[in-house]
A protein has these predicted regions:
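NAD(P)-dependent short-chain dehydrogenase/reductase
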Residues: 2-49, 56
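Glycine-rich Rossmann NAD(P)(H)-binding loop
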Residues: 43-48, 73-80, 132
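Amphipathic alpha-helical segments that line or abut small-molecule/effector binding pockets
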Residues: 55-63, 141, 145
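Mid/C-terminal beta-alpha module of Rossmann-like enzyme folds, strongest
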Residues: 60, 67-115
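Tryptophan-centric aromatic hotspots in well-structured domains and transmembrane helices
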Residues: 18, 27, 70, 83-86, ...
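Residues that recognize and position ribonucleotide moieties
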Residues: 12, 41, 50, 79, ...
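Conserved C-terminal active-site "lid" loop/helix of NAD(P)H-dependent oxidoreductases
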Residues: 82-84, 88, 107-152
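A general structural signal for well-ordered alpha-helical segments in protein cores
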Residues: 1, 27-28, 54, 58, ...
Length: 153
């Protein structure tokens, strides 16, 4: 970001979080696979963020670059949740018979010591995006439902 800011005054820096889409590895696909293979999962309940559907991100970036309102924008799914909430919704929508149990980051780290450290709060506010293009990102649950309706379960 600093390089871009130093290089030009005409830039769009777009920040997102908890991104998932139809291609590649992501949390949704991981949970679906684990939910198929296991009866129970322990998922962190003390880290909050905004699940973001890649299609929504792409759509809003396209709208944004049609303006000349350069700057830094947050572009994430509307609303926030924990990884536990996200995983629970994935299991519900996928029809998996897997119980999702909440745990703390500390408990998770003791079970999986090689897991990556994550921030406790990575939620972003899309205010500048709303003010610039007059449009809001979809609620994370609505976007996830559409995603789940279009993937093989």
């Amino acid at each position: 970001e600093e390089f871009v800011r130093d290089f030009s005054t005409k830039y769009y820096i777009v920040r997102t979080a908890w991104l998932y889409g139809y291609v590649g590895h992501n949390f949704v696909y991981t949970m679906m696979k684990l939910g198929k293979d296991r009866d129970t999962l322990n998922v962190v309940n003390d880290q909050l963020g905004n699940p973001t559907h890649a299609n929504d991100l792409a759509y809003h970036i396209l709208k944004l670059i049609q303006t000349e309102e350069y700057g830094v924008y947050h572009c994430t799914g509307k609303g926030e949740c924990s990884w536990y909430n996200f995983a629970s919704e994935i299991m519900k929508l996928s029809g998996r018979n897997c119980t999702v149990n909440p745990c703390t980051s500390e408990e998770y780290k003791s079970m999986y010591p090689n897991s990556a450290d994550r921030p406790a709060y990575s939620s972003l506010d899309n205010m500048m995006l709303r003010c610039t293009i007059g449009d809001e990102m979809r609620d994370w649950k609505d976007a996830l439902k559409i995603f789940m309706d279009n993937v093989e379960k």
